């Protein structure tokens, strides 16, 4: 095998490797989930991104407010809700209890 054949083989291997690595990069999804979008759109905005890799830093490519944009993701919810914020709890914070009007006690007298 001559040196020119060896050079062609090496260049081909490098190109195939670069293309394969680039394909893998595009499939990588950044951590977190896209924030909820409750906006009703009459017209979509042009996309600012197509994949998470189009966005800088921790930002993800999400459909938000009528178009794809790079936004800061929210934490993923664990099964049963997020430990930091349980929206299913009827009270504003753990340990909160209703107080009787004009009393510091949590027990109200029965009528």
From Swiss-Prot:
Main subcellular location of this protein, as a coarse class: secreted
Tissue and organ expression note: Highly expressed in prostate, skin, lung and esophagus. Weakly expressed in skeletal muscle, epididymis, kidney, trachea, salivary gland, testis and seminal vesicle.
Pfam families: WAP (PF00095)
InterPro entries: Elafin-like_sf (IPR036645), WAP_dom (IPR008197)
Signal peptide annotation: 1-23
GO molecular function terms noted in the UniProt entry: serine-type endopeptidase inhibitor activity
Chain ranges of the WAP domain: 27-74
Cystines in this chain: 34-62, 41-66, 49-61, 55-70
Compositional bias segments (type: Polar residues): 102-111
PROSITE patterns: WAP
Region Disordered, residue ranges: 80-111
Cellular component GO terms held in the UniProt record: extracellular space
Keywords from the named record: Antibiotic, Antimicrobial, Disulfide bond, Protease inhibitor, Secreted, Serine protease inhibitor, Signal
Gene Ontology terms: biological process: antibacterial humoral response; defense response to bacterium; innate immune response
Function: Antibacterial protein. Putative acid-stable proteinase inhibitor.
PANTHER family: WAP FOUR-DISULFIDE CORE DOMAIN PROTEIN 8
Name of the protein in question: WAP four-disulfide core domain protein 12
Native organism: Homo sapiens (Human)
Gene: WFDC12
